[in-house]
């Protein structure tokens, strides 16, 4: 199958499947808060200004799909905190890329609201996607999508 054949939609595409789980505004903001250390329901509700029923629903879904673990931290009264699982932590790069895009294309006059300081060197980080084989930065201009082992072309409806 030629590379140009990938320009149409296809069944089971990874971005679409991922967005079914995390593509909603509140879900992404809950993930952002979790990456910055917020674990408790009340603090999430306050920081985000999210309606409590909406927060409950999103957290329940995030636990069900395996992005968070619900862990008790108090027995009297019973209270839980929400900790990112490995799958949840692996979404960090996606959140950072969205944050960088917002800083670049929807800038605030006073500058970025959040900067990331790299623990190893102590400098503000400017994260990039890097090829693990050659070390070159990956952009939309220097990669080509190819069918992977899970590729299935979506049949056009008649």
Swiss-Prot record:
A GO term for molecular function: DNA-binding transcription factor activity
An individual GO BP term: regulation of DNA-templated transcription
GO cellular component: protein-DNA complex
Keywords: DNA-binding, Transcription, Transcription regulation
Domain HTH hxlR-type: 13-110
Name the record gives this protein: Uncharacterized HTH-type transcriptional regulator Rv3095
Organism for this UniProt entry: Mycobacterium tuberculosis (strain ATCC 25618 / H37Rv)
């Amino acid at each position: 199958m030629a590379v140009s054949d990938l320009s149409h939609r296809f069944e089971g595409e990874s971005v679409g499947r991922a967005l079914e789980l995390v593509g909603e505004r509140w879900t992404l903001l809950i993930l952002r808060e979790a990456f910055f250390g917020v674990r408790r329901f009340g603090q999430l509700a306050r920081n985000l200004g999210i309606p409590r029923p909406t927060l409950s629903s999103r957290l329940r879904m995030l636990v069900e799909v395996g992005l968070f673990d619900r862990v008790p931290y108090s027995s009297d009264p019973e209270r839980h905190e929400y900790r990112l699982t490995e799958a949840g932590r692996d979404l960090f790069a996606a959140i950072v890329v969205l944050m960088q895009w917002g800083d670049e294309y929807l800038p605030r006059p006073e500058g970025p609201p959040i900067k990331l300081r790299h623990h190893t060197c102590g400098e503000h980080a400017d994260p990039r996607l890097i090829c693990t084989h050659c070390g070159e930065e990956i952009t939309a201009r220097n990669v080509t999508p190819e069918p992977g082992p899970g590729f299935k072309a979506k049949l056009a409806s008649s």
